[in-house]
């Protein structure tokens, strides 16, 4: 009985602590991702930089996905 009461109190305490320490409890996760999107620096992203890639039809070596080809497909030659 005492253990059950302690568990209930602990869960209520942790739930209250989560809401108290949240950054913006009014909006929750609704505006979390758009805010992060606008704060992101697109020029710092390595995904946008494909300068060191080989064009289609050039030799790329062993067949693999995500290789040196601009398309990301290496089948002996860039696809």
From Swiss-Prot:
Tissue: Expressed by the venom duct.
Propeptide feature: residues: 23-48
A Gene Ontology molecular function term of the record: toxin activity
Signal peptide extent: 1-22
GO cellular component terms given for this protein: extracellular region
Top-level taxon of origin: Eukaryota
KW Transmembrane helix (keyword) present: no
The keyword Signal belongs to this UniProt entry's keyword annotation: yes
Domain notes: The presence of a 'disulfide through disulfide knot' structurally defines this protein as a knottin. The cysteine framework is VI/VII (C-C-CC-C-C).
Pfam families: Conotoxin (PF02950)
Main location: secreted
Similarity annotation: Belongs to the conotoxin O1 superfamily.
Disulfide bond entries: 53-70, 60-74, 69-78
Protein name, per record: Conotoxin VnMKLT1-01122
Localization in the cell: Secreted
Modified residues (Pyrrolidone carboxylic acid): 51
Keywords of this entry: Cleavage on pair of basic residues, Disulfide bond, Knottin, Neurotoxin, Pyrrolidone carboxylic acid, Secreted, Signal, Toxin
């Amino acid at each position: 009985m005492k253990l059950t009461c302690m568990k209930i109190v602990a869960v209520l305490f942790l739930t209250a602590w989560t809401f108290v320490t949240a950054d913006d409890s009014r909006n929750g996760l609704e505006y979390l991702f758009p805010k992060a999107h606008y704060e992101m620096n697109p020029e710092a992203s390595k995904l946008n930089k494909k300068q060191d890639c080989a064009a289609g039809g050039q030799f790329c070596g062993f067949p693999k996905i995500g290789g040196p080809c601009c398309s990301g497909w290496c089948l002996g030659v860039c696809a």
